[in-house]
C-alpha cells in the first residue's frame, strides 16, 4: 500500500493523495450500535472521523473480551450504564459539522453542509429539548463556531440547542453516576487544540483523575500538527510538532494514553509508539 500511495502522490500530487504511513487505523464497523429514541437523555452525533476509522488493534488486543470495537459502542455503553442513554438517529449518515469543507476553503459547501446538519439536529433533538453529544472536539468546536455560515432560522436553532462535547457529557453527566472499580496507575493526556478553545482541558483532567492515580499532561503537549488531513498528506508536519511531547511521553511511562479527537490520536500514536485512544474507552472499561 505504501508503494501505491507513493506512486499516486508522485503522479497526482501530495496535496491530494495521502501518504500511507503505519500505523493506520482500521476501518470502522458498518452501521451504528443499536439505540432507541424513547427515554433517551441525549442525541448522539458520532463524528464523521469516528464513522470512518475504527478502534486501533492495540486497543482490541489487550485481553479484554468485552472491549468495544468502536467509539460509538463505548459511548453508548457507558452512557446507558450511567442511566443517561443516548440515541443515534437512524438517518445520521451524511451529517457533518462542515469543518472539512472550511479547512479546504470550500465555503459554499461548508455552509450547505452545516445548515443541513443543524436542521437535522433540530429535528432529532425535538426542537432543542434534548442535548446533542458529539464525540470529537474539533467537530464540536466547528459546529459551535458555525453561526456565520447559517441562515437566520438555523442560526436561531443552533443558539437554542445544547451542544456538548463528549468530554463535557462524560465529566458532568456520566461520571457522577458511575462507579469506578480498580484505577490504573497513570494516564497521559494529550489536550487538543479544539478542546483548549472550548475550555475542556480541565474537565478531561478531572475525568482522568477519577480513573488514574496519576495524571500526566506533558509540558510540550501543544498542537499535534495533524490538522485534519494534513498529517496524512504531510506526516512530517505532525512528526516535527510532536517530537518534544513524544520524548516526555516516553519518560512518563503511562498506563493509558488518552485524548478526545481521532486524528490527534493517530498523530500521537505515530509519534510516540503508544496507543492513544479516546478517554471514553478507558471510562467504559473501568466502570463496568
Language-model regions, residue ranges each:
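Iron-sulfur cluster-binding electron-transfer modules in prokaryotic oxidoreductases
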Residues: 1-288
